[in-house]
Amino acid sequence: MQDKRFGELLSEGISSAAKRQRKSMAAIEQEMAEVVGYSRPMLQKWRQGRHLPEDEIVKDLIHYCVTNGRLNRQWADSLLIHIRYPGREQLLAEIFADYALSNEEQPLNNDNGTEPEPACLESPHNIVPIQSPFYIKRPGDSIALKAIARQGVTIIIKGPPQMGKSSLLLQINSAAEQAGKRVAFIDFQQFDRSSLVEADTFFQQFCNLLTHKLDLDNHVADCWTLPLGNRQRLTRYMSHYLLPKLDRPLVLAMDEADVIFDTNFRDDFFGTLRSWHSSRAHNPIWQQLDLVLVTSTEPYLFIKDLDESPFNVGEVIEPADFSLAQVIELNQKHDTPLSSPQVQQLFDLLGGHPYLVRLALYLLMEQRIAPADLFSQAIEERGPFGDHLRHHLSQLRRQTELVEGLHQVITHQTCPDQQIFFRLWGAGLVRREGQAVLPRCQLYAKFFGRYLYD
């Protein structure tokens, strides 16, 4: 069984152990392999996400990383949640009973008065874990967290890719659990392609997955014998079986909703969610259900009837780019690799783009690049942001109308075609400033100004 995310988390653990023990990664790998009784090549397969070890081995791996890498409870919890480890809380209690290393238990200062060591560096490519020191709260966070504390709410998180939407969703889910709610997290990217072709298949699979997430007996087949349409069956299954079976409110947290926009049943599915939202006013059972949806696409391009859309109701959160003060804060959290003038230079270049700011500081902290080279090589195809920029360029060149639209933005600061604008905005390439439409940041203006028509 392949699992890339497990491999990334395990790599973080091995890297932390290597730094703490002042050993090479190879030495730590060999030591870990001996501890768990497997060969180093097998351990490397786990790191690469090519195989997933058995639960007992996972326990030993976590124990090693916590003991030797002083990784905190949040790291261990993220790994166990990801693989759906049975008895997760009990295992965490056992491990950290010996090593009191959770964030809450770590002292702010050592007894000798020295400053605490910098936080264990986290990859900018991953979702930011709960209580991570690298998580930056933005204005939308407080709105979302206040909303989820109430009952019967709908929250929409909308914005371009790599804005931290999934990380915010993780924060919302955690707050919901602390408020005594049950959370069912569904990532639409996990659906097989075959499940996204026929409406009947998708609606049944959605019910099956939701039932599995809630650890309830499956009665989907019984519901599908009723002479009803898919929308009515899904609604009945939710209101007559799932919600009544739960002893507390349910948060249905759905990430990557964009996947459904490309299907022929999007109107039926999203219309169903909208009807659940509206039904709270006259049916108490729906007060027991919170809806949280995350999308990178402007929904109005796909859902023609606004009364059938769940994306224009409830609390709509659009995560903002980082402010200069927040970039300064992140620079400090990364042990200040940039001087104050260089932080301003980074902010001017990236405009507070959350992913690119974190990527830059990560590369600097890892000493993969010097500050001067970061700026001088910024728009090179093989530079520090090269992978990110080449990906966008590749996507644009498949759609000539977007190339022309972005060129118009760069040269004339306008984009008369609203559909083109929203597609460029959805890709995170442009922004509005008053009546003008501008490239998202200086980096994009320079890079696409040079390479768009090459």
Q: What role is predicted for each listed range?
A:
Residues L196-H219:
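Conserved NTP-binding/hydrolysis module of P-loop NTPases
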Residues M1-E31, V35, K59:
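A short, Lys/Arg-rich alpha-helix, primarily the initiator
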Residues I156, A176-S195, L252:
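Conserved catalytic segments around the Walker B and adjacent sensor/switch elements
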Residues L108-Q162, S167-A176, H240-Y241:
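Walker A/P-loop-proximal flanking segment of P-loop NTPase domains
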Residues N264-L349, L363-E366, D373-P384:
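The catalytic "switch" region of P-loop NTPases
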Residues M1-E8, E12, D55-E115:
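Short amphipathic recognition helices of helix-turn-helix/homeodomain-type DNA-binding modules
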Residues T211-M254, D258-R274, S278-D290:
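Mid-core helix/loop region of P-loop NTP-binding domains shared across ATPases and GTPases
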Residues I328, D335-G434, Q442:
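Winged-helix-like regulatory helical subdomains adjacent to P-loop NTPase cores
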